[in-house]
UniProtKB/Swiss-Prot annotation:
Pathway: Cell wall biogenesis; peptidoglycan biosynthesis. The lineage of its organism: Bacteria, Pseudomonadati, Chlorobiota, Chlorobiia, Chlorobiales. This is UDP-N-acetylglucosamine--N-acetylmuramyl-(pentapeptide) pyrophosphoryl-undecaprenol N-acetylglucosamine transferase. InterPro entries: GlcNAc_MurG (IPR006009), Glyco_trans_28_C (IPR007235), GlycoTrans_28_N (IPR004276). It is an enzyme of class 2 (transferase). It is found in: Cell inner membrane. GO terms for biological process: carbohydrate metabolic process; cell division; cell wall organization; lipid glycosylation; peptidoglycan biosynthetic process; regulation of cell shape. The keyword NAD does not apply. It comes from Chlorobium phaeobacteroides (strain DSM 266 / SMG 266 / 2430). Belongs to the glycosyltransferase 28 family. MurG subfamily. It catalyses: di-trans,octa-cis-undecaprenyl diphospho-N-acetyl-alpha-D-muramoyl-L-alanyl-D-glutamyl-meso-2,6-diaminopimeloyl-D-alanyl-D-alanine + UDP-N-acetyl-alpha-D-glucosamine = di-trans,octa-cis-undecaprenyl diphospho-[N-acetyl-alpha-D-glucosaminyl-(1->4)]-N-acetyl-alpha-D-muramoyl-L-alanyl-D-glutamyl-meso-2,6-diaminopimeloyl-D-alanyl-D-alanine + UDP + H(+).
Amino acid sequence: MNVLFAGGGTGGHLYPAVAMAGELQKRVPHVKLSFAGTEAGIEAREIPRLGYRLHLLSVRGLKRGRSLGALVDNLGVLADFIGAVRSALAIINSESPDVVVGTGGFVSAPLLLAAQMRGKKTLIQEQNAFPGVTTKLLSLFASEIHLSFEEAKPYIARKKEVYISGNPSRSFSAIDPDQARLRFGLAESLPTLLVFGGSRGARSINNAVLKWLDQITASANLIWQTGSLDYERIKAGVTSSARIWIGPYIENMGEAYAASELVVCRAGASTIAEVTNTAKPSVLVPYPHATGDHQRHNARALAENGAALLIDDEHLQAPESRQLVLDLLHDRTRRSAMSKAALLLAYPDATAALVDRIIRLAKS
């Protein structure tokens, strides 16, 4: 069996593909796996490190807006795309994959298109509640489309071979909450707030938490991943380390989720998958500049089902937002209801389910 994964740029597009590749290796002896990406994406570093073959394409996204500069730049983008499709056709010819799996990012469009032009089986895995342009267009010709949210269905023109499969994400071993808190050097008996904004951090979330710090630590623990860009600034602004674990990056997120009663975070697809799979009530702060405002759609999908609260980035530092977080942190009954709602939205077997479909397509 030969499977080619096309996706990347960010971890949100890459890691679902990596999870599926790992599952395929476990289940299919001698499976041949390769990836396609761009030199500027996270895949250029991660895929060779993981030992997979990587094909690099030159492709970039369209600039939004109607200015002359945007128009001129987009003509260059179109020329790059045509060149990328030619390169993708060469990759398809040389690799001869049984299935091409697209997980999003600029690179998935030329690879999926080239595969469809060559009559190859294609599977699209869409992570967000608001599908991207590539998914909307190429889903018309894909063998199968797999969505992570029921809310994404209305944006897909076709109705056959469309599945809700969830988003592949990291799996975490069961850990005792008290033991997990001890590993962060925190009191076992206090409710714990987990805050993070990705590996690089989220400045608006960090600024808000810095402002709320005294009120949080008066009656709760705090596990705070600041991100690499903000760590030194935030660390300098924290006058007491009592009841706080603070760091640029959390090595073991399973322990962090186990230790916490409530999570404050962005609403990227991978994060959504993790908070639902771990049944964590959350306060979601969508990144306001995400393409198509897709993080708001993700957050709304949880909020409307009772699994999360949604706070706009611009309102995060308001006193009402701080009080909302503190009240929820100490409201066990409400948190329990949100936890149950989150679990109903979870797809802990997403990776296995998607690999089942890849194997089926390859054999058909």
